[in-house]
C-alpha cells in the first residue's frame, strides 16, 4: 500500500463517519504517522507505507472517526506557531483564543500596567503568551 492508497482509505472512513474535515484530518494523521509534514507527504504519495506506520495511521483514523479531536490524538496543539503538549485533562486552545491574546497584547501596549488573572480557563496558553 502506498501513501495515496492509505490516504484515500482514511478519507473514506472519516467521510463515512461524517467527520467534516475528513480530507485535512486524514492528511494530518497520515503525515504524523510517517513523521512528515503535509507538504512532504503530498509530494511523495507514491511511496510505500511501512506496516508499523500503517498500523499507527489506522489507529489514529479509528480514534478520529469516534470524534476524538486531532490534538488529543497527536498529543499536541499548535498555538502561535509553537507546539504545546495537550492531553484529555486540558481544554484544547482554539483559534479564537489566539485572536483574544492578540487583542489583549495590543491593549497592554496602549497602557502602562495591567493585572491579569487567568483561572480555570484551560491549558493556560493564553496567559503564557500574554
Sequence positions of predicted segments:
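Conserved small/polar residues in nucleotide/adenosyl-binding loops
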Residues: 128-130
